[in-house]
């Protein structure tokens, strides 16, 4: 089939996503959320374990926030590596059609002085 395509998103694209109802998902681990904070409006769903395996609860949690395969989804991680791989899998293997990822991750977001919220473990 065709190579999976996911859209490379900029900080500005994410700001738009916050306003237009796009589902924003932070796929990092809880210790990373605590370290950097999180972007306002993001769903927190860990995609990979520390050793890089797919997190056992990811698919169930992910599917619980998605209404259908056309749902606009924007993923972010630390620097864009994990979301690039995950996004391609969502398109290729699960048939999602509207997936983008924050190319520079939260690292690039914070470099540009964009706001984050603190993460509380109770979330």
Protein language model features and the residues they cover:
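Structural scaffold elements adjacent to functional motifs in cytosolic proteins
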Residues: 24-26
């Amino acid at each position: 089939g065709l190579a999976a395509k996911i859209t490379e998103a900029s900080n500005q694209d994410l700001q738009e996503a916050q306003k237009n109802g796009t589902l924003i998902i932070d796929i990092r681990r809880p210790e990373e959320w605590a370290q950097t904070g999180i972007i306002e409006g993001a769903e927190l769903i860990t995609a990979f374990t520390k050793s890089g395996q797919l997190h056992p609860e990811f698919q169930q949690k992910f599917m619980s926030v998605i209404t259908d395969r056309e749902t606009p989804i924007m993923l972010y991680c630390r620097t864009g590596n994990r979301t690039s791989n995950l996004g391609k899998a969502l398109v290729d293997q699960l048939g999602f059609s509207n997936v983008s990822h924050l190319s520079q991750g939260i690292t690039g977001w914070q470099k540009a002085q964009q706001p984050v919220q603190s993460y509380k473990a109770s979330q």
